[in-house]
Structures are given as structure tokens and as C-alpha cells.
Amino acid sequence: MASPEGTDDEGGGCTGWFHVEAVVKKRTGDIISEDETEEDEGTASDLDGFLDNSNVITTQADRETAQQLLHAQNTYADTQTLHNLKRKYLGSPLGDISNQQFVCREGVKRRIIDTDVADSGYGNTLEVEATQQVQDNTYGSGKQQDGGSQTSVCSRENSIEADSDMDIGATPPQQIQELLKSSNVQAKLCYKFKELFGIPFSELVRTFKSDSTCCHDWICAMFGVNETLAEALKTIIKSQCMYYHIQCLTCTWGVVILMLIRYTCGKNRKTIIKSLSSIVNVPSEQMLVQPPKIRSPAVALYFYKTAMSNISDIYGETPEWIQRQTQIQHSFQDCQFELSKMVQWAFDNDVTDDSDIAFYYAQLADVDSNAQAFLKSNMQAKYVKDCGIMCRHYKRAQQQQMNMKQWITHICSKVDEGGDWRPIVQFLRYQGVDFISFLSYFKLFLRGTPKHNCLVLYGPPNTGKSCFAMSLIQFFQGSVISYVNSHSHFWLQPLDNAKLGMLDDATDACWRYIDEYMRNLLDGNPVSLDRKHKQLVQIKCPPVIITTNINPLHDAKLQYLHSRIHVVPFLNPFPIDTNGNPVYQLNNVNWKCFFERTWSRLDLNNDEDKENHGDSMPTFRCVPGENSRLF
């Protein structure tokens, strides 16, 4: 049977304690005595601890601990962020004490720049403005702070300028150590040089990229030199140079030396650095070595003015490039270029090739004012071409004006003394040639006598035919023609400007060509010669030497040449010693002695020259003379 609703059944079942809890003995409006109140309070105190609230207290304590931990972590993160910003933009206070905090690595900066991803264009604006503001404030206060990490927006100039403050509170050895640790030592040295001497090092020198290029004049800057060694340098270096200009300044790095030096001979940068390092005990990283700008008036004026001050030590005579640009008399000597002087120089020195003229005449700029004006001109190529053409014209006219005797005298005057005629005679005898008969024919050969104008050297290979003929052609400054060019109309053109010609190694086809087209040429009679880009010219063929392995006298098909040639057999192998050198020396010195020895036998004395007691030919002069008389 179901239980009835309500609580009428008091004390029944398990609900009795609810009844006790719910019974209200007092009603609204009843008077409560003080005794009951105290009893009630005592009753309430008896109920303390009836309910377990420890779980609620533990949960609240855990929540408060987590909030405190989060607050501590946020505070620490904010502190670190603020500290990083201060180090980034304001610098570290350690910079005022030590400079070790300011080591700006260029490689690190480059990596930062390379890895920096560009944003929309406004991401780095705050950083740049903050950096500029900090720098302005720093410079405005007249004090720079070192240390701290450098941002990627710092330029190379700012880093160099900040590095210069390393001088404050540091000893010279520490300065040198910091210098060697720098990422760009050369830039740091150049900045220090400008700070001390007031002029950039690059304005005084011209750059040589190669360390092996030689030069006489050099500018050397040495940093961190000991004072005793700096004074000793002035004495030790005198034995190696003709001139030096030394300036010594003292700074926190030690002694800094600026030296302009002219060595007795040309030296390269490697040699100079090695020599100076051994004297002043300074590594190559602490040196700047370059040649000076010898054509700069500003550089010449700088050394000229500093030479008059008391900070410079001078030894030797001042270089001409300084005198020329600073002294009045040298300035007056500057002149305009004259082609005639250049042609006269080329003629006197037998320089007829255009490349040789340009190269050797440019080297005279230090001693010749006309050569200096030539280098300053913008028409050097035209001047070189015109000079070569005129020099060749003069040489050709001089050669054609001389006879054989005068020409031999002329070429002998250009050969050194000390030769011996015996090796030539011994070589002819070694080949079985009768020397007396050879001289008789050689006399007619040099005169260009008809039917005696061609000398043929015949023999097997390696008998010295070409060596003998080439040495004679070289002494005579003759011309060589080659049958390989026979298909050209101009292959005989070299004979037009020669006193002696040569055709080396004539083959059977060459002899057929000579027999068909060149009979008059071998006779020594006048022939018509075709020249390239020029009109035909009529000349008398000079004496010709032909070397061959074929004896033309044994060939019946060449019978018309037999009376026009003289064959000299060379049948024995050319002698060579154990060192590979020829036993018989055939050179210009020996040929000169040979002609001087056989001068009378070759009948080179002419009656028309007896009245001339001086040179066979007057001295050529193409430079206009100057009248020194005053009217």
C-alpha cells in the first residue's frame, strides 16, 4: 500500500530527523528572552564543524595560487621585453667602462639584413625612427654610448664612427687587438688615417690590385709602431731608397707613420710589406701600401707643404713629379706635343714598329716633357701611326742613299766590339770551302755585279746552311722572302727596302718558278716590282742568298740559271758541343770583326770617299733648329 502524502505520520519511518529539523517552536511576534538567545548561540557553536568545508577552501587557494603564478610570469616577460628594448635602443651602461660590448660583426649584420623579410612598407618605420632618434640624442649630448646589439639599419659609416670611440679608456695593445678583430680592417685604418692626418688615404694614392706590380714610388701608412722602432726606421731605410718623406703622429694606438718613399729599384707590394714588417715589427694587417698619384697637383702640394713643417723628416732629392707640379720653373717647361721630336727619337733609336714606338716613348714621360705631353694628348694613336710612317720613310731614304760600303760601315757602328773573325773562316773550311775563292766571289756578290748577284748554299739537311745565311742577313738587316707566298703579286715587295735578300729552302717547284719568272732578278738588273697599295716601282735587285737541298747545277732543266748563280756546297753536319751550343759562333759581333779584317780584300774602299775624313753619312736631324742670337 502506498505511503500517504504529507508529514502527518510524525516519527514514522526514516524521516523523523527531518521533523526535528523542521519544527519551529517560536512563532512570529513571540517574545524571546535573553536566556534563550544565549542558549541559541551556544547551540550554534555546538554545530561548528557539522558541515565539511575544507574542499571549498582548498579549491579557492589553488585558484589564487594560479593567478599569482600567471601574474609573476607576465611580469617577468614584460620585464625582459622592456630590458631588451632598452639594450636595443639605449645601449648598455657597460659601454662607458669597457669597449668589449661594442663589437659589431659585419657578417652578423649581413645575415640579419638577408633574413629580414620585407613587409607592407610600414613594419620597420618605428624601428628606424627610434634608431635615428637615439642617435640624434646621443650626438646632441656630445657623448657616444658603446655596447648593445647593433641593428641591421646601422650603416658602415656609423659602425666605423662608433668603433673609433674604442680609444677611450683602453691601452694600445687592446686597441690593436680590437683592430685585428674588426670585420673591415682596411676601412678602419683608412678612417683612423683621416682622423689623424686630416686627408683621406685614397686621395693620396692610386690603387694597385695586384701585389706583384712593381713601382719605384710608394706611400706606406703603418699603425701601432713602437716609438723606438719608428726612430730606427729613419736610419735603416736610407740604404734602400733615394728619397723618403716620413711623418710620425702619436695616438692611443701608438705611433702612426706616413711615409712617401722612392726605392733605388722597382719593388712590389709584397716585398715592401715584408721589408717594413721586419724593421718596425708590425704585421701586414696594420699597413696601407699603395703608389702615389704622381699626376695629381693636390698630392704634390700636400707633400710639398708638409715637407716644410717640423713634423716631417726628409732624406734625398725631391722627386721630379713633385717639383714639376709645385715649382714655377718646372711649370714653365711644360710644352705642347711636337711630332718632330718623337720622330727624331724613333729615328735615332731605330724604332720603326708602331707598337714599340708607343710603348717605349710613353716610358720617357718622367724625363722628357714632349713624351709627357704625348701622354696627355687624346690623339696618341694618330701620333704613333704618323711617327712610324715618317720614321720608315726617313730610314728608307737613308738606306737608298748609301752604297754597300757605307751601309756596312753604318751597321758596323751599331755593333759592339770584341768579336772574332776566326769562327767564320773555320766554319767555311770545315765545310770544305776554299776561303780565297769564296772571298773573290763574295766581293763581286756584295757589289751586285751582273751574273754574280746570287749565292746558292747547297747541301744535305742539318749542315748549317740556314744558320750561316740567317746570321749574315741579321747583320746586314736584310729581308727574307718565302716561296709560300708566291701566289701573291706582292711576295717580292720586301726586296724593295733591303740591301741583302734571302730565300730559304728552295724546293724543285721554287727553282722552276725562278727559272720561269726571275732570271733578270738573279742577274742583278733593274726589274719592275709590284707593291701593295702602291704603284709599280723599278728597282735593282739586291744580292740574294738561296739555301737549298737540290743542286741546281745537276739539273739540266735549269741550264739557263747555271750562269747566273754561284753554288757553295755545305756537305758536313753542323758541329754541336755537348751542351747543345754551336761550336762556331756566327753572330753580329763576329761578322763585324770579319768585315773589318777582310775590308781591303773585299775592295770596299772607294776613291770618292777619300776626301771625307768624317762619318760616311752626315747625322740626320728632323727637329728644327733654334736661333740663339738676339736681333
UniProtKB/Swiss-Prot annotation:
It catalyses: Couples ATP hydrolysis with the unwinding of duplex DNA by translocating in the 3'-5' direction; ATP + H2O = ADP + phosphate + H(+). The keyword Chaperone does not apply. Residues 168-334 are annotated as: DNA-binding region. Keywords: ATP-binding, DNA replication, DNA-binding, Early protein, Helicase, Host nucleus, Hydrolase, Isomerase, Isopeptide bond, Nucleotide-binding, Phosphoprotein, Ubl conjugation. The modification Phosphoserine is found at S92. Phosphorylated. ATP binds at G459, P460, P461, N462, T463, G464, K465, S466. Its EC number is 5.6.2.4. One of its GO terms (biological process) is DNA replication. It is an enzyme of class 5 (isomerase). There is a cross-link at K540 (Glycyl lysine isopeptide (Lys-Gly) (interchain with G-Cter in SUMO)). Its main location: host cell. Residues 28-48 are annotated as: Disordered. A motif (Nuclear localization signal) lies at residues 86-88. ATP-dependent DNA 3'-5' helicase required for initiation of viral DNA replication. It forms a complex with the viral E2 protein. The E1-E2 complex binds to the replication origin which contains binding sites for both proteins. During the initial step, a dimer of E1 interacts with a dimer of protein E2 leading to a complex that binds the viral origin of replication with high specificity. Then, a second dimer of E1 displaces the E2 dimer in an ATP-dependent manner to form the E1 tetramer. Can form hexamers. Interacts with E2 protein; this interaction increases E1 DNA binding specificity. Interacts with host DNA polymerase subunit POLA2. Interacts with host single stranded DNA-binding protein RPA1. Interacts with host TOP1; this interaction stimulates the enzymatic activity of TOP1. Belongs to the papillomaviridae E1 protein family. This is Replication protein E1. It comes from Human papillomavirus 30. The gene is E1.
